A protein has these predicted regions:
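Structured alpha/beta reader/binder surfaces that contact nucleic acids or chromatin modification marks
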Residues: 2-155
């Protein structure tokens, strides 16, 4: 068994993968940096609708290899969990109804071993693309997170 950091989030897999992070958590960074994996589970009851995922409430939908823990750029009293690789999963009822949206939980090593992890594509602010086709090929079109300029080809 491997112990993982588990979060209950309203954000979609697409947003998390695009950012390469799950953001703005109250956690102990010294404890969190000892974990290898982040498991994201769906919070369907959050009122915010932007980037809302489609999975069922409490379903695990993403397992990520943690890169590091850093201060949140949006809230300096919170932390973001950065990851370098991810695998999409579907594990029903994974969240255990805890009231705290972050917890530590064991996951079977066989589940981890059988996953097909993909590397995060990293785009730096100010990346210039030749044309709109490159933006589409990188799945960055209509991206509200980075404010893509589709006419100028700038991310």
């Amino acid at each position: 068994m491997t112990t993982a950091l588990v979060v209950l989030t309203y954000k979609s897999a697409e947003e998390l993968i695009l950012k390469g992070a799950s953001d703005a958590w109250r956690l102990n960074p010294e404890k969190a940096k000892n974990f290898k994996y982040l498991i994201c589970t769906r919070n369907k009851h959050d009122k915010r609708k932007i980037w809302h995922g489609k999975e069922k409430h409490r379903e695990a939908f993403l397992i990520c290899k943690i890169k590091d823990i850093s201060k949140s750029i949006h809230n300096p009293s919170r932390y973001q969990i950065n990851f370098k690789e991810y695998a999409k999963v579907s594990i029903k009822e994974y969240w255990s109804k805890d009231r705290n949206p972050i917890m530590y939980k064991n996951i079977d090593d066989e589940i981890i071993k059988n996953l097909n992890f993909k590397k995060i594509d990293e785009f730096n602010e100010g990346t210039v693309f030749k044309d709109r086709k490159q933006i589409l090929n990188n799945n960055l079109h209509n991206n509200l997170v980075f404010g893509i300029s589709q006419t100028d080809g700038i991310a």
